């Protein structure tokens, strides 16, 4: 009889959501047996309340300087997938360098990815409204550059370094989506979440009108 050592099989890592989603080359793979994205407005409102309470705690100084990260969104369980044969379908030219199967927390992570697209769209709209003659133009450009290009983008996409576009949706669903080097968004991503992320990324790269959540 094989004995499973739970402590060795599951390692915990306390990190912020931003740290988790900003890992270089990270792709999140949702197994087919996991339910589709199904959160309604009540679930999203609860997540926003949790975020708000955490930010208020930081503002009140109730969180120490060395832990000023948003660490209050619950547990996320992932498993590193090193065998590409377990990813289906697969384009071997477009596999991210780090694949994590998302076992628990996919509704939260998916919602956060969608929220990041909303913030990205809004920040870009604000930046475009500020004219170069405005005294704060450079500061606004710098803020947008830091938050959009260095933070928000990494929450819903990863840079493959090749393909058209080089940015790919961070989250896909088994048997419905596959990371692709050059195929169209509609060919590669058929789940509602990944299809939206794919079209959002394409519009961002092409500098065209960014889609909105319906």
Report residues per predicted region:
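Glycine- and hydrophobic-rich flexible loops that cap the catalytic core of alpha/beta enzyme folds
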Residues: 2-214
């Amino acid at each position: 009889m094989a004995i499973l050592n739970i402590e060795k099989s599951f390692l915990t890592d306390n990190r912020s959501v931003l740290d988790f989603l900003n890992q270089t080359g990270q792709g999140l793979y949702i197994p087919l047996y996991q339910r589709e994205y199904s959160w309604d407005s009540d679930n999203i409102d609860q997540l926003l309340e949790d975020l708000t309470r955490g930010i208020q705690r930081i503002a009140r100084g109730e969180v120490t300087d060395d832990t000023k990260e948003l660490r209050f969104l619950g547990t996320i369980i992932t498993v590193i997938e090193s065998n590409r044969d377990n990813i289906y379908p697969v384009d071997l030219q477009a596999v991210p360098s780090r694949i994590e199967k998302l076992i628990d927390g996919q509704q939260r992570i998916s919602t956060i990815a969608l929220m990041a697209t909303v913030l990205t769209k809004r920040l870009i709209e604000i930046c475009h409204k500020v004219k170069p003659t405005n005294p704060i133009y450079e500061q606004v450009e710098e803020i947008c550059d830091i938050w959009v290009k260095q933070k928000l983008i990494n929450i819903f996409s990863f840079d493959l370094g090749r393909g058209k576009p080089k940015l790919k949706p961070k989250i896909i669903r088994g048997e419905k989506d596959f990371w692709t080097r050059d195929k169209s968004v509609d060919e590669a991503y058929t789940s509602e979440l990944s299809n939206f992320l794919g079209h959002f990324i394409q519009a961002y790269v092409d500098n065209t009108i960014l889609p909105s959540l319906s």
